[in-house]
Swiss-Prot record:
The gene is H2B1. It is found in: Nucleus; Chromosome. PANTHER family: HISTONE H2B. It comes from the Eukaryota. The keyword Cytoplasm does not apply. One of its GO terms (cellular component) is nucleosome. Monoubiquitination of Lys-109 gives a specific tag for epigenetic transcriptional activation and is also prerequisite for histone H3 'Lys-4' and 'Lys-79' methylation. Core component of nucleosome. Nucleosomes wrap and compact DNA into chromatin, limiting DNA accessibility to the cellular machineries which require DNA as a template. Histones thereby play a central role in transcription regulation, DNA repair, DNA replication and chromosomal stability. DNA accessibility is regulated via a complex set of post-translational modifications of histones, also called histone code, and nucleosome remodeling. Pfam families: Histone (PF00125). This is Histone H2B. Residues 7-21 have a biased composition (Basic residues). The nucleosome is a histone octamer containing two molecules each of H2A, H2B, H3 and H4 assembled in one H3-H4 heterotetramer and two H2A-H2B heterodimers. The octamer wraps approximately 147 bp of DNA. It comes from Euplotes crassus. Residues 1-21 are annotated as: Disordered.
């Protein structure tokens, strides 16, 4: 049975109400870190986009590696230990040490609050 004009009008009205989906970015956090390190330096939209893509890529790789570790160990729960190991596997030397220490600090701060 074809849609009645009233139903069609209602559907068109509902379609008009759809809003553009908001995309989450790390721009605010990238900017905060930039200002902590170099207060006098700015960043272009293109550079911010590249940094955002980089962070999304790294987080995706860490999540993928951590999920593999969970499966290898025949576990069902992803814990901070798997994430920490994934970071150690993916990031080189000193960068991994700093990432692990900052991550541990963040988890401690979160659990204590």
């Amino acid at each position: 049975m074809p849609a009645t004009p009233a139903k069609r009008a209602k559907r068109v009205q509902q379609e008009k109400r759809h809003h553009k989906k908001r995309t989450e970015t790390f721009s605010v956090y990238i900017y905060r870190v930039l200002k902590q390190v170099h207060p006098e330096t700015g960043v272009s939209k293109k550079s911010m986009s590249i940094m955002n893509s980089f962070i999304n890529d790294i987080f995706e790789k860490i999540a993928l590696e951590a999920s593999k570790l969970v499966r290898y160990n025949k576990k069902h729960t992803l814990s901070s230990r798997e994430v920490q190991t994934a970071v150690r596997l993916l990031l080189p030397g000193e960068l991994a040490k700093h990432a692990v220490s900052e991550g541990t600090k963040a988890v401690t701060k979160y659990t204590s609050s």
